[in-house]
Amino acid sequence: MSFEISRKQYTDLYGPTVGDSVRLADTELFLCVEKDYAAIGEEVAFGGGKVIRDGMGQNGTLVRDVDIPDTVITNVIVLDYTGVYKADVALRDGKIFRIGKAGNPNVMENVDIVIGVATDIIAGEGKILTAGGIDTHVHFLGTDQVNTALASGITTMIGGGTGPSQASMATTVTPGQWNTYNMLSAFEGMPMNFGILGKGHGSSKSPLAEQVRAGAIGLKIHEDWGATPSSINTALEVADDMDIQVALHSDTLNEAGFVEDTIEAIAGRVIHTFHTEGAGGGHAPDLIRVAALPNVLPASTNPTLPYTRNTVEEHLDMVMVAHHLNPDIPEDVAFADSRIRAETIAAEDVLHDMGIFSITSSDSQAMGRVGETITRTWQVADHMKRTRGSLTGDAPYNDNNRLRRFIAKYTINPAIAHGVDYVVGSVEEGKFADLVLWDPKFFGVKPDLVIKGGLMVNSLMGDSNGSIPTPQPRTLRNTWGAFGQAVSRSSITFLSQDAIDANVPDLLNLRKQIRGVRGVRNLTKRDMKLNAEMPDIRVDPETYQVFVNGELITSKPAETVPMARRYFLF
């Protein structure tokens, strides 16, 4: 005999199912569940009077070695570049083990995931699960950046620096073997995945290559060190030899050449361009053109995202401080002013919406905010829906195409750009279990739970002296997986394969998991998931207006943004 309940009652019990829509935070963006792995009437849920009990939803006889997961997240909505669906997600040995239907095959049919005695349960009903974010543009200045980023949903930080030196504040570079070794050692106690960018400036390949052998997973070229065609070519030659990425902050002042000269120096080799719009630095006024090239993986940094009525005004002082400029020197002021063009900033959001710009990142404390990359990515998506309407294929209360495009910008695409997508960047079986669980009304703003390597490392928790977990103030705090030797299980240090071959982990007694970067030099723009468009892009040299395939591309500055004051007191 079948039993019927209302759709609302079902949603209250097990979360939304196929055809249901969910608003993300206070935006105009809605996800719509496309598939549900659950068998209706056979759902598993944990709690008093519920299903996951010995002999019911839990198998009480099988030992862990018989493919029993360590943790199952039940009835959760997965939002990933691969799709929008509802499932039970099993974690085992720090990886995503299986995605499907959980339960006990002794009493249930079509069970993909067997819940056993060894299995912990995280209730995902009504929640959204995403991959942990990946920030590829981090200036390693202060250690507090790590917790700030983690509490925003970022689980991998790639960048450079040695602390608050002037060069680190400006250039995202960890120079030389000694500094690289020290930073790799410092990463050991932090619940975050890390990768280091070395200095990509040298007249010969040897001093660049030694940084890669020391552990750098990429080389950074920055105009403050001189982004010359010679530096670009030498860095790319080393990258081709050692299968690493080159990140480029190009020549704002056009000292050593114009954008055409930089394109010529790159010579068709893959490169990851930072703040490709140009306000963060790069050939004035037309760096943005490189986003059309098949060998360029173009990124934005978050201070220009989205374009608002305050964006231009805040940037002048930001440039002056970040690049050690003197406001009393007219040439320094002119340099800063040349980087800030409302016309190209206005085009940037649209280029993201069209899938031309592929990646978002922070530029932490150096013209960017390390805890806002995820929030600002979704603010852009919201602003674009409000001003440009739905994307092709989307519908009322269904923005899945736009959502998949935008989530790819801070998950899978940065992972691909740095050769770590075989480990992190998506919710797929076999990947390292770096996952973020969100309450929809706080989506993109404040996570409920951050999981790293299958361990809970940061969580929304109430007063620790409370009789229950929920008394105010509820704040995001590090939990057990972020402490002691658990950090070595929950987190990864990414190294070049040359550094692994040189036994750097043993030399430094690194205890974190080690993974090598790979497959970087074979990449093209076509590898950027859902963000691989390559139209003709032109910039008017007098008005700075941006044209895509001959059509003017611009947007009005937002007067207000979602995911802002409603969620933050400060």
From Swiss-Prot:
Catalyses: urea + 2 H2O + H(+) = hydrogencarbonate + 2 NH4(+)
Q: Which organism is it from?
A: Corynebacterium glutamicum (strain ATCC 13032 / DSM 20300 / JCM 1318 / BCRC 11384 / CCUG 27702 / LMG 3730 / NBRC 12168 / NCIMB 10025 / NRRL B-2784 / 534)
Return the PANTHER family for the record. Answer: UREASE
Compartments (UniProt record): Cytoplasm
Essential cofactor(s): Ni cation
- UniProt keyword terms in alphabetical order: Cytoplasm, Hydrolase, Metal-binding, Nickel
The Urease domain sits at 132-570
Name the UniProt record assigns to this protein = Urease subunit alpha
Q: Where is the active site?
A: H323 (proton donor)
Q: From the UniProt record, report the name of the gene that encodes this protein.
A: ureC
PTM note says: Carboxylation allows a single lysine to coordinate two nickel ions.
